[in-house]
Amino acid sequence: MRLRREISEFFTLAWFTRVLIIWALEVAGLLFLVAILPGLTVINWDTAIWTILLISLLNALIWPTLVYLTVPFTVLTFILLTLVFNGFIIWLSGQIDPSFESIGYWSISLGALGLTVINALLIGFLAIDFHESYHRYVIQQFSSKKANSAKFNTPGVMFLEIDGLSAPVLRNAIEMGQMPTLARWLNSGSHRLIEWECDLSSQTAASQAGILHGNNFDIPAFRWYEKDNGKIMVSNHPRHTAEIEQRMSNGNGLLVNEGASRGNMFSGDAPDVMFTFSTLAGLSNVHTKTYYHYFINPYNFARMIELFIWDIVLEKYAAWKQKLTDERPRVRRRGAYPILRAFTTIFLRELSIYMLIGDMFKGIPSAYTTFVGYDEVAHHSGIERPDAIDVLRKLDHQFARLEEAANQSPRRYHFVVLSDHGQSQGATFLQRHNMTLAECVRRLISEEHAVESAEHASEGWGSLNAFLTEFMKDEERRASRILRGIIKPRTYSGNVVLGPDHRHYVHDKKPIEKRAAEVVVLPSGNLGLVYFTDWKERLSYEKIRENFPNVIPGLVQHPGIGFIMVRSEENGPMAIGAKGTHFLENGMIEGEDPLKNFSSNAPEHLRRSDTFPHVPDILVNS
């Protein structure tokens, strides 16, 4: 009975529709192979066309069945079976029909390989986002191994973080019909949309440390300089992230009770972590097994490859369209960025969803996952540009799949969708003023002073580096050993470093103070941090005016700077703008309030940042 039910579920109308489409395209593909391969020859087209139709029909029928049968095995088994099958039917066709001639081992082998590639592309493309396909090849595979539901009396929680998504953008996306799953949850009353305001440093490290550990004290920006040790701390460098978590955690984080951390910056003290920046240094081999389980499934493998390639095509089209219409502001999107984008929007998303579905069928009590794709695309395309909204639409579709899996899992689950921070649309400081903040500071001090700066690399590079670092640490897998050999020149202290931050890691072997840099300028989103390294303590407003008399007046009068914060020996912390000063200690305002166009909470944010041990000598706000 079970076999009969499985057969009836497999051979559906959708299956037969796909077979017909594949058949037609197989004919075109085989005709193409006959045209380009010298060993495949058609002597009489009147009769050979029927042979070609037969070969194509056999492929169209057998291939979906092979995918179904080989799901429990590996991609290698799947490829070998299809190569042997295609080679056999090409040879057999030549024996049966003299008008279809296949001469020589290589012509048969290349023909078989060509058919296999064509089949893989067709099957992957046609099943790429079919609900039925995903259900059968992913959800049902987990469902067959799910835990005993009798064990779980309390519901679990899945925390789904969309990196960099602001409340207004989310509302607009829902109103435009781009996020129907979230709209349905809101309309049903199961969810509410609540807006919150993040800290002064609007970035993942500060927000996620607070969410997962209840503490984000002394994270002044995405990257900052520490005078006590002469080191630049970068939030998404694994060894720095581990150190930050050690400072933040009291051992009782959000996920401490048998929870799971998936693709986050911090662990939330979860006992089960995968692809989490702060724990990469202590990984064991078990953590990479899920990756292998994902890729040995032929459906997952074909789906990932085709989605990845298609996203690169979408990115190239979006970049071309921006240039064609002269859409501004825009940033450079060449080089490795299309691959980096596909890695964050497709590769990490697909792995994260796969891991969460597996977690739910195991019945884990809680899991927290960060989806970084929207943030990466929004930084390059714009926060509400079509391709950024498209990332949200596709992510919403994945949330529906999680919901479907939860309905079949052994434990009931609640979904909490949240964001760590938002972002605003605008040109960069460099685009507007033809100089970086570091160059601006350099012009305001004497030439004898050395100025050090560090590029703010895309967070996507950090995600890619973290994944490669985790993957290569598996001593048992040959693929990991090969990867270690390939990227050894870009590996430092056991961590992979690709992208612009490679230069920072080279420099990081020597503390900044030993390289005679007297001024360190670090950009971080809307903030700029200026440190004077000849002083071990925080330099006061009065001493800055005494030693660098042009810096403060020059910064506050610059059209690209909203205000700066410094600490006065006499008046305490002050926010200084072009036309006035806000004395943060007592709330007094002299002249025009530089904070009037910002949140009403801005003074409180600044007062708190002023208490950080590693707050800069001058905090610059755009």
Pin down the residues of each PLM region:
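Juxtamembrane/disordered regions of integral membrane proteins
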Residues: 1-106, 110, 114, 118-130
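His/Asp/Glu-rich, glycine-adjacent segments
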Residues: 131-133, 214-382, 487-496, 522-541, ...
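Active-site-proximal N-terminal segment of extracellular/periplasmic enzymes that hydrolyze or transfer
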Residues: 133-190, 432
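Short, structured active-site-proximal loop/turn typified by the sulfatase FGly-forming signature C/S-X-P-X-R
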Residues: 172-209, 214-218
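Short secondary-structure boundary/capping segments
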Residues: 173-178, 279-283, 382-389, 425-441, ...
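A long, amphipathic alpha-helix that forms part
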Residues: 346-347, 367, 374-415, 439-449, ...
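Metal-dependent active-site segment of extracytoplasmic phospho-/sulfohydrolases and closely related
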Residues: 396-436, 573-576
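Histidine-centered active-site microenvironments of extracellular/periplasmic hydrolases
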Residues: 421-526, 579, 584-595, 615-616, ...
